[in-house]
Amino acid sequence: MTQRASPVSFAGPKRFMKPGISIEELPHIDLIVISHNHYDHLDRLTLEKIYQKQEDQPPKIFVPLRQKKWFEGLDITNVVEMDWWEEQEFEVWKIHAVPVQHWSSRSLWDRNQVLWAGWVLEHPKFRFFFAGDTGYSKDFINLGKKFDGFDLAAIPIGAYEPRWFMKQSH
């Protein structure tokens, strides 16, 4: 839970508030889904701290297509890479990578070189949709139809300015 969403610690967007909970206070985590590779969604130090805390039972991490390579050289294992519409089973869950309207980049030279994804986590008793960052698109209608609706959804609110830049992806 670094202070900046940036490749460097001294520049870039700074956190406005402290996280609501520390890594040490987190309960045991079984799985993590990563929506895309922007620095505010994929933080190396945070993931490393979670793994260190749970080294006996590390969480399984689900990432969009071509994102697994980023984990090479880190002491983080159990990474599962998925393309849109792929499904993996994890314990009683079905994990689905699904399309959303966004993009990926960690530098000026790698725009859209890895995929971004929303996630549907299906349990025998309920369905959860995690959008990550996304603009409004027909994907919402298509996902609702394909999965017969959701019991719970985490959909982003905010990141609207400047509108000319953000309207397609937030």
Q: Would you name each region that the model predicts?
A:
Residues 15, 19, 23, 31, ...:
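Cap/insert and terminal regions of metallo-dependent hydrolase folds
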Residues 42, 105, 163:
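Glycine/Thr-rich phosphate-binding loops of Rossmann-like dinucleotide-binding domains
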Residues 1-37, 46-52, 105-111, 137-148:
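Pre-active-site segment of Zn-dependent metallo-hydrolases
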Residues 52-58:
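Conserved S-adenosyl-L-methionine
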Residues 1, 37, 100-102, 132-134, ...:
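Active-site metal-binding loops of divalent metal-dependent hydrolases
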Residues 34, 96, 155:
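Redox-cofactor binding/interface segments in oxidoreductases and associated redox assembly factors
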Residues 55, 63-126:
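Metallo-beta-lactamase
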